[in-house]
């Protein structure tokens, strides 16, 4: 798939089968960093093989961490507590799950580092995290536009003068980065570390993932709801010995959606009713749209209408603040709804791999949908009968755009996905797995 300029999707009629999900991107990169910061050795299984995890692995090796060879999703990391390499230039691609947490960890350890990424990474805000780290005395310099990467880290005087405040309304990754790095500073300073959230915290389930994983590495965080988080002065990460990565719940959304519009059943394995990922809640969105959803330990299954034969999903008006990534799948499913659909509270889309509100608006209109959008909302009216249009779908160098619009193959229009290789960020084999579930239209 890598290197292909485009992929013409075969017109699809039915979907059924089972998919073993790749490892969660959010969990994979968190666990890699936690294992590096922990005492002892951690054997990680089920690790996602993707651009973002390869970026994190390369950075850890560059920082002096002993990282074993990755084989079949397994890798062993020897924890170092403090990175041996105190001067480095790190290229972190477009991986926010690597850039933000590494920025915090490096800033609180001391040293001299330069962090950069692809041009889009330099358009994704990091100012709120930098402002919070500067409250600890961290020396951080913007090497381009203020508030954005690239960054130079070093030259500060780290201290703890009281609670540190961080804005929560732009990205939950800023709070995640501070939480994960806080035990490093607590140990160094001998003081409790308190982080206070300013504004409305978005994407709360991702913070739950962070707290859950920190606990598995031996650090429990005291919290006052979503307003304040305290890490004790004696907090120390300790490797759990062995750590299995859950399947990616955001990726599960595309396959569960296939079951909802292609009859099904489609079952995903690797996530289930006991998942720590908030995006499993997308299954409830599908149920509200009329799909039959079933859960078990380590699996979720959907059955639904056959939109290629005239079936329709129920329209929705929903707040997607808690599951912004999976919400993109809902936006594409709106093509098959029985009325206009509205997605609210999705302002975080603006600062993802691309401006996803603008990108989704543009590409849905190409297919004939009526689309309106604002700062943090999107409304999609499905194409009128006879109103579908053949389209070349731009993916905007965004893996989720490519995967979402694979669902458009169930409509009557011819669909071409441009730059399908962008799925390598999280799921290089996506289109092969997708094709294995489909029955084509005659």
Swiss-Prot record:
Pathway: Metabolic intermediate biosynthesis; chorismate biosynthesis; chorismate from D-erythrose 4-phosphate and phosphoenolpyruvate: step 6/7. It is found in: Cytoplasm. Its EC number is 2.5.1.19. The keyword Cytoplasm applies. One of its GO terms (biological process) is amino acid biosynthetic process. One of its GO terms (cellular component) is cytoplasm. CDD domains: EPSP_synthase. Pfam families: EPSP_synthase. It catalyses: 3-phosphoshikimate + phosphoenolpyruvate = 5-O-(1-carboxyvinyl)-3-phosphoshikimate + phosphate. Belongs to the EPSP synthase family. This is 3-phosphoshikimate 1-carboxyvinyltransferase. It comes from Bordetella pertussis (strain Tohama I / ATCC BAA-589 / NCTC 13251). The gene is aroA.
């Amino acid at each position: 798939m890598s290197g292909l300029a485009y992929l013409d999707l075969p017109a699809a009629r039915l979907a059924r089968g089972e998919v073993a999900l790749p490892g969660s991107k959010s969990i994979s990169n968190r666990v890699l960093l936690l294992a590096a910061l922990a005492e002892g050795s951690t054997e990680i299984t089920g690790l996602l093989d993707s651009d973002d995890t390869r970026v994190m692995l390369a950075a850890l090796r560059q920082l002096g961490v002993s990282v074993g060879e990755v084989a079949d999703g397994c890798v062993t990391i020897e924890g170092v507590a403090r990175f041996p390499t105190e001067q480095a230039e790190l290229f972190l691609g477009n991986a926010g799950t690597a850039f933000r947490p590494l920025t915090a960890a490096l800033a609180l350890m001391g040293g001299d580092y330069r962090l950069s990424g692809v041009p889009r990474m330099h358009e994704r805000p990091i100012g709120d995290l930098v402002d919070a780290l500067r409250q600890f005395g961290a020396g951080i310099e913007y090497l381009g536009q203020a508030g954005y990467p690239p960054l130079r880290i070093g030259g500060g005087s780290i201290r703890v003068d009281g609670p540190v405040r961080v804005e929560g309304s732009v990205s939950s990754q800023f709070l995640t980065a501070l939480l994960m790095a806080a035990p490093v500073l607590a140990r160094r300073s001998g003081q409790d570390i308190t982080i206070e959230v300013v504004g409305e915290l978005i994407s709360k389930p991702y913070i739950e993932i962070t707290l859950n994983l920190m606990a598995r590495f031996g650090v429990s965080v005291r919290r006052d709801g979503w307003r304040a988080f305290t890490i004790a002065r004696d907090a120390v990460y300790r490797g759990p010995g062995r750590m299995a990565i859950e399947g990616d719940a955001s990726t599960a959304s595309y396959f569960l959606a296939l079951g909802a519009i292609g009859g099904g059943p489609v079952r995903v394995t690797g996530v289930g009713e006991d998942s720590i990922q908030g995006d499993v809640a997308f299954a409830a969105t599908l149920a509200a749209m009329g799909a039959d959803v079933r859960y078990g330990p380590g699996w979720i299954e959907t059955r639904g209408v056959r939109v290629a034969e005239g079936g329709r999903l129920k329209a929705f008006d929903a707040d997607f603040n808690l599951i912004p990534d999976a919400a993109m799948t809902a936006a594409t499913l709106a093509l098959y709804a029985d009325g206009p659909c509205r997605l609210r509270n999705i302002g975080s889309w603006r600062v993802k791999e691309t401006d996803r509100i603008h990108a989704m608006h543009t590409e849905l209109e190409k297919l004939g949908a009526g689309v309106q959008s604002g700062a943090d909302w999107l409304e999609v009216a499905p194409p009128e009968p006879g109103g579908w249009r053949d389209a070349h779908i731009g993916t905007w160098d965004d893996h989720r755009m490519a995967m979402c619009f694979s669902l458009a193959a169930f409509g009557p229009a011819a669909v071409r996905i441009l730059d399908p290789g962008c799925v390598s960020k999280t799921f290089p084999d996506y289109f092969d797995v997708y094709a294995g579930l489909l029955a084509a239209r005659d």
